[in-house]
Swiss-Prot record:
It comes from Rhodospirillum centenum (strain ATCC 51521 / SW). GO terms for cellular component: cytoplasm. PROSITE patterns: FKBP_PPIASE. One of its GO terms (molecular function) is protein folding chaperone. This is Trigger factor. Residues 163-248 form the PPIase FKBP-type domain. Keywords: Cell cycle, Cell division, Chaperone, Cytoplasm, Isomerase, Rotamase. It is found in: Cytoplasm. Involved in protein export. Acts as a chaperone by maintaining the newly synthesized protein in an open conformation. Functions as a peptidyl-prolyl cis-trans isomerase.
């Protein structure tokens, strides 16, 4: 087998591979002999079938099999001999072959770039943090109590107003026809909550206890029941009672109703939950800033094929969002050429950062353990309460799905490793500042 490098351009390499005719013939003969040992043909004992008959019956399929294997072997040998690090599967094209002649094929391959990661200790990252104050815990308790609210009778009769709870019977129709789910009795509705069709609650403001009202509304265009989208509906409504909402009392009994020993224990749990949530958001902001700094300090070439794959995924997602009306309003105003240029730059950034994180992980022996993969599977199952068994079964029967969890775990471990190397400073901010999109302050930044 002869391997000749024919082109070297950036990360792209091209080779010409020649497999001698006698090697092809030997491979074919060996494969036919293997078949002859097991194949059953009437009139012949296994292993005694004439080679001529084997060639007649199986020669064509065996030749195809041998050529495919020869190409695979030749490609692998080219990679090994030239110490290549392919970024993607090499592209192979058979350029010459006739029965009894040499096999010639070309192989084009893009390589992973060789580069030196920057000195991480020279990179500065600011991490926004939130201190959970007692007042924040108080607000959290009040929100929980509001969700546990009851209602109390009016001290004096008056018309319903926003914020009141009205007890109603209602019966709706569309185009004069009754529809399922449009009738209810003794339903408690908080006016102004937005829990009913837009406009419904507004038309009950000012109603008195015992009053009957006809309410006309229009279902939103994006209503979940497509047959009702954009339709006008008429509801006959009887206001049976008007009550005022009453938040639950925040006391020891309130805490015990949630399974806590006392109110202090509930406050501690709320504080810990807040601290965990804000710590997660804080890490996300630090990670984003780190990736921005890494993108600024690294500009090595990246394989075009990898960028093409990443761009295609982004572009398909964008096209679906545009179709569903969920795309960024700014994207809707841009021409296709401008959008493609913008998102190709994002694709290139993502590929470069991915290669950088992979190299940092490789150099520092960062790996993903079986236990970490198992914990990730458990976390996925917890996202689907009541369906945990089905989730576990899915991952058990689909090992490739488990492997799909490896990349994000690896990325997080490498990011945490780098954050431990950089000059990391913390800055105390408000909850509003922590939640604010950094692009609002820093201008557009291509997401990693």
């Amino acid at each position: 087998m002869q391997i000749t490098e024919t082109s070297a351009d950036g990360l792209r390499r091209e080779f010409k591979v020649t497999v001698p005719a006698d090697e092809i013939e030997t491979r074919v003969a060996n494969r036919l002999s293997e078949i002859g040992k097991t194949i059953k043909i009437p009139g012949f004992r296994p292993g005694k079938v004439p080679m001529a008959l084997l060639k007649q019956r199986y020669g064509q399929s065996v030749m195809g099999e041998v050529l495919e294997q020869a190409v695979n072997d030749g490609s692998a040998k080219a990679v090994e001999e030239h110490k290549l690090r392919p970024a993607l599967q090499p592209k192979v094209e058979v350029t010459k072959f006739e029965a009894g002649s040499d096999l010639e094929f070309s192989m084009a391959v893009e390589l992973l770039p060789d580069f030196e990661p920057a000195d991480m200790a020279a990179i500065a990252v600011e991490k926004p943090v939130v201190e959970v104050a007692d007042a924040m815990v108080d607000d959290g308790l009040k929100r929980i109590a509001a969700n546990r609210k009851t209602s109390a009778p009016l001290e004096a009769e008056r018309p319903a107003q926003s914020g009141d709870i009205v007890v109603i019977d209602f019966d709706g129709s569309v185009d004069g026809e009754k529809r399922p789910g449009m009738k209810g009795e003794d339903h408690e509705l908080e006016l102004g909550s937005g829990s009913f069709i837009p406009g419904f609650e507004d038309q009950l403001v000012g109603a008195a206890k015992g009053e009957h009202r006809t309410v006309t509304v229009t279902f939103p265009e994006n209503y979940h029941a497509a047959e009702l989208s954009g339709k006008e509906a008429v509801f006959e409504v009887d206001v049976k009672d008007i009550r005022v909402p009453k938040a639950a009392e925040i006391d020891e009994d309130f805490a015990k109703s949630f399974g806590f020993d006392d109110l202090a224990g509930m406050r501690d749990a709320i504080r810990e939950r807040m601290q965990a949530d804000y710590a997660s958001m804080s890490r996300m902001r630090a990670k984003r800033q780190l990736l921005d700094r890494l993108a600024e300090t690294h500009d090595f070439p990246v394989p075009t094929g990898m960028v093409d794959i990443e761009f295609d995924q982004i572009w398909r997602r964008l096209q679906q969002e545009l179709k569903d009306g969920e795309a960024d309003p700014e994207d809707k105003e841009k021409d296709e050429e401008g959008l493609k240029a913008e998102y190709r730059a994002i694709a290139e950034r993502r590929v470069r950062l991915g290669l950088l994180l992979s190299e940092v992980g490789r150099r520092n022996n960062i790996t993903v353990t079986r236990d970490e993969l198992g914990q990730a599977v458990v976390a996925e199952a917890q996202r689907y309460p009541g369906q945990e068994r089905q989730v576990f079964d899915f991952f058990r029967n689909n090992p490739q799905a488990v492997e799909g969890l490896r990349a994000p775990i690896f990325e997080d471990k490498v990011v945490d490793f780098i954050l431990g190397q950089v000059k990391l400073t913390e800055r105390t901010v408000s909850v509003e500042d922590l939640m604010r999109d950094p692009e609002e302050d820093e201008g557009p930044t291509a997401a990693a």
